[in-house]
Amino acid sequence: MYLYLRLILALLMVQCFHAHAETERNRIRFGIPTAPSSLDPRFSVDAVSARLQNLVHRSLVRFEETQMVVPDLAEWEKLGPLHYRFTINEGAYFNNGNKVVASDVHATYKSILDPEMLSPHIGGLKNIREIIELDDRTVDFFLNKADHFFPDSLSIGILPAAYVQNPPSKDIFAASAGPFEVLSWTTNEPLVLRRRKDGHIFEFIAIKDSNARSLRLISGEIDIMQGDVPPHIYASLLQRPDLYGKRIAGNTFSYLGFNLRDGITSDPRFRQALAHAINRDAILKFLFQGSARKAWALFPPSHWAGAENLNGFSYNPTLSREIIAEINPTATPIILNYKTSTNKFRQRVANVIQSQLASVGVDMKIEILDFGTLMGEISRGDFQSYSLSWVGLRTSDMYRQIFHSKSVPPLGKNRGHYKSIRADELIEMAEKESDLHLRRNLYKKLQFLLLEELPYVPLWFEDHLVVMRKDIQSYTTNIDGGYSALIDTQRSRK
């Protein structure tokens, strides 16, 4: 009897071990640089939140790799210059089994358009005059003015109408339509998602410091590391036999921004001098180690609204000194206040730019701020110059949001208060143009104008660097750094 009990106990222990091993095999831990601010698609303001929202929710439309819009939850037809009809697919369901219906679409967009909701997406949707539900599967959008590319603006995740009307205190969605569902999310704890098709668990663990994240990856505490991976750390991690990496050409656009309302930065000659003084080739080679490419405009040439063969400023410190001497005939250096984040790699970049500008007679004073404070001050216009990146730009309406004179905060993202009659004309002409080829040509003219006037100094497009443990299979990212490949990611059996 004693031997029999020992045998039963041993069998139970083996079963428990295998069950635990199987559970761990089906759990993948993803190291991210910051925790999401919200999983509610109406309020996404940061890249991590937007990428996670795309796992939890589905939208009426989605974007292909070329950033052209295609149907997702619904097909659409244009019934008139001011009238679009969306028909929801029969197979569109929330994870609780309820169908996605027109009232869900209506409730989601109505709430975004409510000024009291303070959704950051309201500016891109103000052209909507009315939303009408025709039946459970059909919803009509009526516009204030013609917009031939209106569907581009409808990539926001659809929420159940019941959630919109009675939201919980935390973004724990009782029903969502995406390929993943939220299991748990509490303060200072990982976000835990479950993949709907097979129940596999994915933990998203926020580790701000890239060195700490690297150590967690090496120790096996996380399986995937993506976002704010410095190139030198990426290269070092790839030396380990238990890790491998992927580098994907990205569209993260880094730039220098300026306050154009007054002071030295309002002088286009000064901005031209700064552009000629920055040796981007050296920065890309020695700091980025080849993981970024020179940028001349907001979108890369592969984007339909981008442009080939943009020839802007060159590295020419001699010309820069001549312009500076013309602006400032005294021997006293021009002082330029520059704001950047606490990210150590961004500080290294700032230090190199500071040194390059010093050689042409500009004394750049660097102010380091945490990201929230930095964004707050820039949004208020409390800066002379700064460096930031636009992440995941997709739609051509960003030209209006960033460069139109009527798009200053809070109405848009023209933080430097750039005002150009010609830029406004080109943006408005492009928005009215129904022919894609002609619209692209208008945006190309706009990009040449922006290179002349330099409200921004474009710097580079940064690649997305991902490092994984060797047993992680079928994960990659795309041009805007999305996590959508997690739909098929697995851990291999040993």
Where are each of the predicted segments found?
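Alpha-helical secondary-structure segments
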Residues: 29, 101-108, 136-140, 179, ...
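Ligand-site clamp/hinge motif
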Residues: 189, 194-235, 363-365
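Extracytoplasmic/peripheral linker and loop segments enriched in polar/acidic and small residues
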Residues: 365-374, 401-470
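Gly/Pro-rich hinge or "lid" segments in bacterial periplasmic/extracellular proteins
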Residues: 145-203, 209-212, 318, 322
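Long beta-strand-rich cores associated with HINT superfamily self-processing modules
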Residues: 466-494
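Append "and occasionally in soluble cytosolic enzymes with long acidic Gly/Pro-rich linkers
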Residues: 183, 266-355, 360, 419, ...
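N-terminal lobe/hinge region of extracytoplasmic solute-binding protein
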Residues: 31-81, 87, 110, 175-176
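Surface-exposed binding/hinge segments that line
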Residues: 5, 121-164
